[in-house]
Amino acid sequence: MEKRLMLAVTISIVLMLVYPLFLAKISPPTIENNMQEDISQQLDNTKVTRTALPKTTTVTADSKRQLPEDAVSTPFSTTRYGLIFSNIGGSIQKIVIKDDKRLDSDLVEDAMFDAGILAIEGDASLRGLSSQSFTITRDTNTLYTEKDGLRVEKTVKFLKDQYGLRASIALTNISQASKPISFQITTASNISSKEAYESRYIEAGTYHRNDKMQRLAGGKLKKSNELKERDIYWLYLKNKYYSIICKPEFDVSGVFTRYVSGNPVIGFIIDDRDIQPGETRTYEFKYYIGPTEIHELEKVDDSFGKALNFGIFTSISMVLLSVLKFFYSIFHNYGVAILLLTCCISVVMFPLTFKSMSSMRKLQELQPKIEKIRAEHKDNPQKLNKEIMEIYRRHKANPMGGCLPMLLQMPIFIALYQTLMRSVELKGANFLWIKDLSMPDAAFHMPFSLPFLGNAINILPILMIGAMILQQKLSQVKAAGGQTDQQKMMSSIMPVMFGFIFYNLPSGLVMYWLTNTLLTSTLQFSLLRKT
């Protein structure tokens, strides 16, 4: 049964660690009643109109264009943002998130030409607009230009005390002839993926009026896609901790994704009726640009909370996150909050854990009898199985009794793993010697690096190895013939393997596993004393 226990735990760990990679290849499962599909799958089943932009105005990964000599970068600063506008294309080139809870973060960098946020590229008078020089007026946060009888004016208004802004695009026909309006506007691009393993969390997607989420991640985000649908409510691009969400205040024709110079670029497709001489047409957008934190998201728009996704067990993760934040509101330290959350989970899971341990203990005590029967009936498999099942029946032991309770706990383990891996609340949070609970604890640094481990000495994974060895010692009972070589090998290898897996994971997650292991060991010790 010890092998079954190790198998169950190993499956749990593998699922938790492989899950982020798995998410990059499939669409996330439902969140409450939300249907979530992959955009690429939708493209296979939906008639899509593809409009290739002119090659002369598109930056590709193979030919990165340089800004002209007359390029001017103009900074705008608020309590929440540091933005840099470029006069070339009249777009946002860089975004720095200001956060009093954690270090400022460079969210977007080097977004130029049609990859610049709010950049427009289209047909007729709008062709080449992403390379056009704009005039920037700081007093009104306005950028404007004129091209082929069309005046284009972009205005940005910042929302007070929120990670939000409103952007408007005003097109005025200053010619004597009507002008066709068909263009693409970039709403998000070049989102940061500097932190270790962060690129696996980069995803884009759309939220629809029928409460449906569509997402695109991993290798599929590197392909050019266009989806012509008019029920799109908003579009997002996010990394592990931060999100850029854009909600149009009008009906769009669809969305597009591109991969420019190694970065994802997303935006809206707008096919509108011709604009008449003297007419002005305005397109309004609401933006959220900030940490993926539910109360900040919902400050800007009630529906933006849908962007917070922890995977298949999001509903459980949201409960765990609420409990974590409740403890933080009392003790003002996320390290303490994680310890208390771990204790709460252990209390809730106690009946299942106790049942699992009791069942395994009973099966271990029956091992001498089972081994004796194996020796007596080794040449008669049918008789052997019958005798073993009779022993289980007589002693009211269930061979699956140790594994099943653990498997029932797996959703909580996976949900908590995702919560501690993705919650921006832990970013920059310290505890004891740990400077950042979203990163390995890195108590010391060596002058050299080890393969796969790096040069940091992480104390928590080492303590976790010791705790797991202690837990295994407590779970062992003396059986006839002692432990098999296989059991001894498992006892030696498993803690080291787990320590290796957890070595560079966030310290908040490792702290949970260490605390949970110690609590489980205490329960095992109490059970051992009673038997």
What kind of region is each of these model predictions?
Residues 1-41, 85, 169-170, 186, ...:
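Helix-loop-helix
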Residues 1-5, 70, 221:
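Short, charged low-complexity linear motifs
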